[in-house]
């Protein structure tokens, strides 16, 4: 019997006894995915739905997003909720740069994702032209359940790591789930 087979048999026996085996990277990714702290960056009507996601009915805290952070230095996730004006874009970029690595961005609503329903010269047409976006949440405004689903999608992405082996960011995910009857 090969050494590898003996080791696998021993691991299986220890797992039956309740001992957990994992890599350090998986453990850190699990911890990060279950403690995502969002930065407050509500810009318009979507911010109201973002706040509603923390109420008793929706309870975003059960996914580890306990408290919205006012300081970017304490946040992991920036939720861009609403339209982004061209004057506000450099400020948002600066806030994103102040967030510690690893950091993620959720683009919430039609205005943040594509500029909104109207082509307005003062509005940035895509938030991903200012900061890299990891998850898009469609809707005008999206319901709190859609934001919670986006956080769940981001958790999956964080567990699988948001970067590949060369250090490049993985492509964004569209968080779409039917939230109404």
Curated annotation (Swiss-Prot):
Cellular localization per UniProt: Cell membrane
Its membrane topology: Peripheral membrane protein
Chief location category: membrane
Sites where the protein binds [4Fe-4S] cluster: 45-46, 111, 140
Record-listed E.C. numbers: 7.1.1.-
Cofactors required: [4Fe-4S] cluster
A GO cellular component annotation in the UniProt record: respiratory chain complex I
GO molecular function, one term: 4 iron, 4 sulfur cluster binding
Signal sequence residues: none
Cofactor-binding details, from the entry: Binds 1 [4Fe-4S] cluster per subunit. This [4Fe-4S] cluster is referred to as N2.
One example of a Gene Ontology biological process annotation: aerobic respiration
The keyword Metal-binding is annotated on this UniProt entry: yes
Catalytic reaction list: a quinone + NADH + 5 H(+)(in) = a quinol + NAD(+) + 4 H(+)(out)
Enzyme class per UniProt: translocase
A Pfam cross-reference name: Oxidored_q6
Alphabetical keyword list: 4Fe-4S, Cell membrane, Iron, Iron-sulfur, Membrane, Metal-binding, NAD, Quinone, Translocase
UniProt cross-references to InterPro entries, sorted A to Z: NADH_UbQ_OxRdtase-like_20kDa (IPR006137), NADH_UQ_OxRdtase_20Kd_su (IPR006138)
Quaternary structure, from the entry: NDH-1 is composed of 15 different subunits, Nqo1 to Nqo15. The complex has a L-shaped structure, with the hydrophobic arm (subunits Nqo7, Nqo8 and Nqo10 to Nqo14) embedded in the membrane and the hydrophilic peripheral arm (subunits Nqo1 to Nqo6, Nqo9 and Nqo15) protruding into the bacterial cytoplasm. The hydrophilic domain contains all the redox centers. This subunit interacts extensively with Nqo4.
Protein family (similarity comment): Belongs to the complex I 20 kDa subunit family.
Classification via HAMAP family: NDH1_NuoB
Summary of the function given for this chain in its UniProt record: NDH-1 shuttles electrons from NADH, via FMN and iron-sulfur (Fe-S) centers, to quinones in the respiratory chain. The immediate electron acceptor for the enzyme in this species is menaquinone. Couples the redox reaction to proton translocation (for every two electrons transferred, four hydrogen ions are translocated across the cytoplasmic membrane), and thus conserves the redox energy in a proton gradient required for the synthesis of ATP.
Protein name from the UniProt record: NADH-quinone oxidoreductase subunit 6
Organism: Thermus thermophilus (strain ATCC 27634 / DSM 579 / HB8)
């Amino acid at each position: 019997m090969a050494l590898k087979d003996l080791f696998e048999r021993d691991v299986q026996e220890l797992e039956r006894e309740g001992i957990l085996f994992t890599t350090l990277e998986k453990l850190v990714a699990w911890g990060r995915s279950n403690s995502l702290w969002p930065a407050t960056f509500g810009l318009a009507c979507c911010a109201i739905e973002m706040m509603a996601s923390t109420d008793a009915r929706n309870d975003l805290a059960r996914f580890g997003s306990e408290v919205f952070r006012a300081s970017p230095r304490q946040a992991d996730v920036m939720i861009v909720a609403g339209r982004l004006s061209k004057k506000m874009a450099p400020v948002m970029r600066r806030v994103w740069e102040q967030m510690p690595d690893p950091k993620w961005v959720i683009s919430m609503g039609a205005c943040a994702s594509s500029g909104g329903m109207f082509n307005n010269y003062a509005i940035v047409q895509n938030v991903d032209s200012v900061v890299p976006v990891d998850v898009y949440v469609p809707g005008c405004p999206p319901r709190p359940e859609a934001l919670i689903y986006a956080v769940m999608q981001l958790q999956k992405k964080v567990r699988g790591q948001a970067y590949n082996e060369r250090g490049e960011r993985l492509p964004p995910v569209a968080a779409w789930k039917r939230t109404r009857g």
